Amino acid sequence: MTAAELVYQLETDILTNMIRLLKRGAIGSAQWQAEKLGQLGTLRAMNEAAINKNLTKAIIEAQKEIEKRGRIGAAVIDAYAVIKKLKLPPGADAKMDQLLGMFGRQTASEFNRMGATMLRSADRVFVSASESIHAQVIAGAKSGRQAIAETVSGWSKAGLKAFTDKAGRQWTPEAYAQVITRSTTANVRREAQYERMDEYGLDLIQISS
């Protein structure tokens, strides 16, 4: 599975955890709503377990892809250097490893921040859902199960909108993971090529993407 697919699985697990707790008790009653607020700690523990299960795997897959792209970028310069009969100085591979390691750590940090944001977002969504379900049931607009079914349907369509960018656009976790991975792979390929050119003493050369 790709990093984005693993994050999607994580999002699904978190939503499933919320649904499981919402379905417990006399749905929509005042006591039920109070119970849901009291279950935030339980939800947090369940979601932390889901994150521990899938986020580490997602980080590993993202780091693999990033390293692969970096080495592909370096290989393009190596091929050019062979044509020009240039030799790679000693220690160049170690420097490349350091560069790729830096990008790998940066990616892990981004994904870990994403996991923390998902936890906070799940808490807010759960509380909001319990309030909405309670209000609908008390008003007689829907039964408890109807209100939950509508809530779940909305989550299925929209996902867990946990991230907002500078333009105010909202992103699901898997979409955000794709953005992180795409951006980092583009950067690591470029920086790996620059690093290799520096090692060979090459000026900027035109490279097809």
Question: What is the predicted function of each stretch?
Answer:
Residues 1-167:
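N-terminal leader/targeting and assembly helices and adjacent pre-domain segments
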Residues 154-157, 161-209:
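Acidic, glycine-rich two-metal-ion catalytic cores of nucleic acid-processing enzymes
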